[in-house]
Every structure is written in structure tokens, then in C-alpha cells.
């Protein structure tokens, strides 16, 4: 459990992770526009109980994913809109779709430094997913690592040191897991379609 830095921190239900129907979300950072996002949700009959930005994050993800039925690409675009030069380099048809998404959901788009890690059961496609999304201004870093071999492990953290510490701990429990990942990637922000988010899928 990780307690939030804002909201009703005294209540254990305000701690991470927050869980939707098919996903669990943890969050690093905070929203500058919490009240705007909460108002956006209330207009859709969703009312946060614990006044934390993490809670509204998972409500947003669940709204876009389950209620609206958006594919993951559109969910991420609604949360972290593609910006400026990255937007200009998109194909014209994708620009049209993204512009419509941004216009529809700009008041629900988190503003400020934030970074989500989401564990998701994509039951319709019979797979589990580990997803990392960061704000497109890249105010919070994001590192993804993949350990391959006898045991495949995908990890998303704010820092490489946290990934290495996690692998070291896992290797003490299971010798098939090495202490260093085979590959590391840093998110660059700007656009999830070009390295601004990571998705690790495990087919069921």
C-alpha cells in the first residue's frame, strides 16, 4: 500500500492501488487540475469518495476503457494528449481522430507531473497487460525493463535503480530471475505513439 500525498490521507481506502473492474492503478505525482477532472467525472455521474488524484485517475481509465469502449490507444490519448511537433508528424487521419478525442476530453485530461502504472485484465482479448503512461510534458520520468530467459518479467518504474532493486529481490526468491534486465527503455514524452508509454502484454 502507498498512501496518497493529497486527499483524505487518514483513510486506508485512499491508499494505492486503486482498483476498477478490470484494472489496478498506482500513481506518482499530482494533478494541478484535480477539481476540473473531478467535475468532468461528476458530469458523467462518477463521484470520487477520497479526494485523491489517484482515485480520479482510475475512474478516468475505467470510464474510457469500459464505459466508452475505447481501444487502449484512444484511452491513452484522452489521458495524455499528443502535443505540438509530435501531433504535426502524425498521419492526417490520426490527427483527425486525436483532435476529436482531445476536444471531447480535454477537461478530463490530467495536468501536471504524473505517471501511472496500470495492471489490466484485458479479458476480451484474453491477455494481461502492464501499462506505463506518463504526462506528455515528461515532468515525471518513466523506465521500462524487460527480463527475458527462463522467466520473462516486465517492469515499469520511475527510476532504473528501482527496477534493479526489484529484480534483485525477485532473484533471491527465484534463482531463474537475474539481477539485471536484458533491456531498458526510457519514455520520452510528447506522444504515446512514439515512446511516451509502455505496454507489456501476457497472452492468457
PLM regions and their residue ranges:
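N-terminal segments that mediate ammonia production and transfer
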Residues: 1-204
